[in-house]
Amino acid sequence: VTTRALRESTQINGVREYIYGDRISRIHWNATAKTGIWKSKEFERESLPKTVVMLDRCRTHYRGAAHFELAVSVAASLLEYGQRQQLAMGLLSVGKEAVYLEPGKLSSHYRRMQHHLIGAEADGSHPIQRVLQERVRHFDPGCFFVIVSPLADERMYQALRWIQLRQTNPCLVAVDAGLDRQAAGEWQRRLRARGIVFYAVDRLEQLPDALGGGAR
């Protein structure tokens, strides 16, 4: 989730179908009169691209249970943040079983994603890029794709570039990747040169600062 996806605005960005419960002040009277169908004003935040959070569940990528639990906590925190911001977010989680929940905003949808994370295990064996290749048809062009993973190496770089070349906006949240300061700096520069957003999170407490842009 990048700051580009979190801007709040009251500026009208377009017109959408009327949804039961919309306030009268939201009705777009001109569009309704022209089409004969109820229309509502769409604001900038509502029209922002959808976001998919991918949790890396490959067993060999983690040093142990605590390492994976940190990744799960980061993914859960990202979803909580998205819910507070009223963003349309989805979840991709592939281990022994594959789960893909399309981006949505309903509270029930967020509860379903969080419920999945509670029982998620690091029981996968497929490389990141293979997981993406098998599911790329589900991702809308222009969507934000956030990978939560401990990988910060050539395999991850190629996966991020592969996503980017398919008209999505990749972001990596590297969870306790074990990079020293020099290696982390080189990794950041390499991704930044490609326009890829990168956050390094070694502890869950660092995530709020990262979301605020301080770790990019």
Residue ranges and their predicted role:
Residues 70-73, 112, 186:
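Generic recognition of stable, solvent-exposed alpha-helical segments in well-folded globular domains
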Residues 12, 48, 110-111, 184:
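Alpha-helix initiation and N-capping motif
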Residues 41, 64, 105-110, 203:
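Intrinsic-disorder/low-complexity, polar/charged segments
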Residues 99-133:
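Short, charged loop segments at secondary-structure junctions
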Residues 40, 101-104, 157-159, 183:
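Short, well-ordered secondary-structure micro-motifs
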Residues 122-216:
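Von Willebrand factor type A / integrin I
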Residues 1-101, 144-148, 162:
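An amphipathic, basic-hydrophobic helix/alpha-beta surface used to engage anionic
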